Amino acid sequence: MPVLNTLRRSLLILALACTLPSLAMDRNALLDQANVLLLPRERAIPQLELVDQNDQPFSTETLKGRWHILFFGFTACPDICPTTLSEMRRLFGQLPAETREQLQLVLITADPARDTPQQLKTYLSYYRAGFIGLTGNMEQLQRLSKALGLPFVPATETEGDYSVSHSGNLALVGPDGSLRGHIRAPLKLDGLQRVLPQILDNER
């Protein structure tokens, strides 16, 4: 009997040794298919005071308690931003309700000279109710940009028809308010639909 028990334990250990790497590979494959890169450890985000699309104060502390997807852009953006928002609208419509309830999309302007709260509110209303827009002074915005790993180059102009160079990636922030990873462009909606519920369930 002791020999039999030892054999059973050995077989169980062997089965786990084979299964765990397989699970890790499956998870990594899902992340790759979704163009998601999770950080090996959380990264703190500085406390900053911004303004939302309703002209109300919005502290980065407000990010706590819920998962957020954040990206930088601007309302006059001709390509990246409308594409990102359209795809995010589609993704939110495809996600399970329980995942959607835990997740919030936030557009942070890289063009505060033109993107007033009212401008952000009007712009976001074309996509999905509940999407948040943030603005603030350039120093605060650049600090947040650096903390999130989403660079943008401030425009030298403040009037007229000008563009702003910015990253097409999105940041994934956990309910503790820390940076957890990035969703890289181009967005892969099928992969995101599969992997986001797992991330939200497993990465508390």
UniProtKB/Swiss-Prot annotation:
<keyword id="KW-0186">Copper</keyword>
<dbReference type="GO" id="GO:0046872">
    <property type="term" value="F:metal ion binding"/>
</dbReference>
<dbReference type="InterPro" id="IPR036249">
    <property type="entry name" value="Thioredoxin-like_sf"/>
</dbReference>
<feature type="binding site">
    <location>
        <position position="77"/>
    </location>
    <ligand>
        <name>Cu cation</name>
    </ligand>
</feature>
<feature type="binding site">
    <location>
        <position position="81"/>
    </location>
    <ligand>
        <name>Cu cation</name>
    </ligand>
</feature>
<dbReference type="Pfam" id="PF02630">
    <property type="entry name" value="SCO1-SenC"/>
</dbReference>
<keyword id="KW-0479">Metal-binding</keyword>
<protein>
    <recommendedName>
        <fullName>Putative copper-binding protein</fullName>
    </recommendedName>
</protein>
<feature type="binding site">
    <location>
        <position position="166"/>
    </location>
    <ligand>
        <name>Cu cation</name>
    </ligand>
</feature>
<comment type="similarity">
    <text>Belongs to the SCO1/2 family.</text>
</comment>
<dbReference type="InterPro" id="IPR003782">
    <property type="entry name" value="SCO1/SenC"/>
</dbReference>
